[in-house]
């Protein structure tokens, strides 16, 4: 079974947030809203949830996932930041960007992108995500809720819930979310490189 809970993103009740966190702490997999569509979220040490995401989305086992963070302070605990990286991320977040950076040793192997030890991090501009991460008090591993069939671009939350029913533990329904990917920015080199154009503007280049 999969539970569905409807939440006002601008007025989530403490009991609702506690319930979501409880599902995560018990090893659950959730679907939740972000500023770039619905995403799947789980705790970084939860290998079983990661494997469920791979099956649900039909992904390669070497697929990389990103950390959903509450603040730049959380980002700094996961990746190595140069001064220029810090300034750019502070300028663009919260917002629809994912940044690729060298990971620190404490980053879960469930998230790392490659043997170079890089990882993706983002700070979504969504009130419910911010509230949830504050209560959870740790970043979430995250993956866009994209179904294996590229034609299944579902915007209605009831239809989306039906598609993932039985494959997740909790669907956090906060209504419509724009379905457009984050802008993917590689910060591992001397200059920022855009790996994917998405919802975030790139006039900072």
Model-identified regions with their sequence ranges:
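Active-site-adjacent structural elements in enzyme catalytic cores
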Residues: 1-205
């Amino acid at each position: 079974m999969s539970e569905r809970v409807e939440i006002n993103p601008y007025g989530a009740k403490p009991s609702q947030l506690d319930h979501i966190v409880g599902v995560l702490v018990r090893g659950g997999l959730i679907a939740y809203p972000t500023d770039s569509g619905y995403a799947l979220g789980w705790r970084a040490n939860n290998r079983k949830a990661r494997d469920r995401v791979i099956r649900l989305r039909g992904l390669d086992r070497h697929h990389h996932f990103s950390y959903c963070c509450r603040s730049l302070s959380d980002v700094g605990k996961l990746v190595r930041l140069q001064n220029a990286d810090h300034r750019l991320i502070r300028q663009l977040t919260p917002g629809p960007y994912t940044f690729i950076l060298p990971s620190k040793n404490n980053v879960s192997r469930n998230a790392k992108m490659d043997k170079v030890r890089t990882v993706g991090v983002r700070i979504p501009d969504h009130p419910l995500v911010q509230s949830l991460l504050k209560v959870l008090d740790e970043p979430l591993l995250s993956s866009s809720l994209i179904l294996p069939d590229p034609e299944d671009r579902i915007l209605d939350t009831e239809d989306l819930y039906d598609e993932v029913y039985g494959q997740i533990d909790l669907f956090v329904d906060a209504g419509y979310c724009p379905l457009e990917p984050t802008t993917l920015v590689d910060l591992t080199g001397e200059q920022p490189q855009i790996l994917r154009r998405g919802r975030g503007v790139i006039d900072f280049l």
